[in-house]
């Protein structure tokens, strides 16, 4: 079943526009009949309630009036459970109606958009279902959101390390995060048992190794730090990397977190992990980005948050400045 796009009624459309004119968050519901429902809510709580949209997804991201939705095609799985399950990749607009759609075999994992909404990136597992799996294989693909056209798999880009071309048959890439200029991005590369942070250039189709041990990077709004998950024995520790000094700061979250985090602002990050109860539903937590404080629930029974900040709204609407 592909991501559905039934237009909102007029009242709902007006409420959506009202929320979109202020800082807000787009996320997935995690419980009950509304599981996977893409939902929008004002960050400051001034909106009387969260607003559901017509889309259902397994992973989403949203920026600059554009979004990407990854969704298992469960109808195909029911018909033939022995085949690969197609994933619907949907690019949608500010009305949460699909603009471009296609399918790809795999398991949905990560999704991101550039700050200006020009490019989208997504990662699927081609084999395996976890980054713990040493035999897993990924595909990470860049898209032009205007046309829906593929800009290539990161495995097709040239990779450089220590000033030399770096090549190996077992490269796996995942977890793209874009800089403000949209051309520059960061991602994870695994070669053998070694994990690297790479910096990418969309136009040059080039990747450069920067640092070791960085999985699922997420660039801060000011472009100075990367939040990521760091392998610590049998778990992942949320950590922040200062790009100027390459100093790493472990965050106060002590639970195992397998997520590509989202920055709420330059001081706090959001991420999904299992609730501290027996139900094991996901919730979105918030924790300071400087290693202080403690984690707290930001959105109960929710996942895959995408934050639209004040400066993002002004970028889209210069008349508001």
Per-region residue spans from a language model:
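Sequence signature of WD/YWTD-type beta-propeller architectures
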Residues: 1-321
């Amino acid at each position: 079943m592909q991501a559905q796009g039934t237009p909102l009624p007029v009242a709902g459309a007006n409420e959506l526009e009202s929320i979109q004119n202020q800082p807000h968050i787009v996320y997935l519901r995690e419980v009950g009949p509304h599981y996977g429902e893409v939902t929008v809510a004002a960050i400051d709580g001034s909106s009387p309630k969260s607003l559901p949209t017509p889309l259902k997804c397994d992973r989403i991201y949203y920026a600059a009036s554009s979004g990407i939705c990854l969704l298992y095609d469960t109808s195909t799985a029911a018909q033939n459970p022995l085949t690969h399950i197609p994933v619907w990749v949907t690019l949608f607009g500010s009305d949460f109606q699909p603009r471009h759609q296609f399918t790809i075999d795999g398991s949905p994992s990560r999704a991101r958009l550039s700050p200006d909404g020009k490019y989208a990136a997504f990662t699927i597992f081609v084999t395996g279902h976890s980054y713990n799996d040493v035999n897993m294989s990924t595909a990470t693909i860049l898209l032009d959101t205007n046309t829906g056209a593929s800009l290539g798999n990161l495995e097709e880009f040239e990779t450089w390390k220590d000033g030399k071309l770096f090549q190996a048959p077992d490269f796996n890439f995942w977890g793209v995060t874009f800089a403000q200029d949209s051309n520059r991005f960061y991602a994870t590369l695994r070669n053998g048992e070694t994990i690297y942070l790479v910096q990418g250039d969309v136009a040059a189709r080039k990747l450069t190794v920067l640092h070791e041990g960085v999985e699922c990077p997420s660039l801060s709004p000011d472009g100075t730090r990367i939040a990521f998950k760091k392998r610590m024995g049998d778990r992942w520790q949320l950590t922040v990397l200062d790009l100027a000094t390459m100093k790493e700061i472990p965050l106060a979250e002590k639970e195992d977190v397998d997520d590509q985090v989202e920055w709420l602002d330059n001081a706090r990050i959001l991420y999904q992990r299992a609730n501290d109860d027996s139900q094991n539903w996901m919730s979105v937590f918030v924790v300071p980005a400087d290693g202080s404080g403690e984690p707290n629930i930001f959105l109960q029974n929710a996942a895959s948050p995408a934050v639209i900040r004040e400066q993002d709204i002004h970028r889209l609407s210069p008349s508001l400045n």
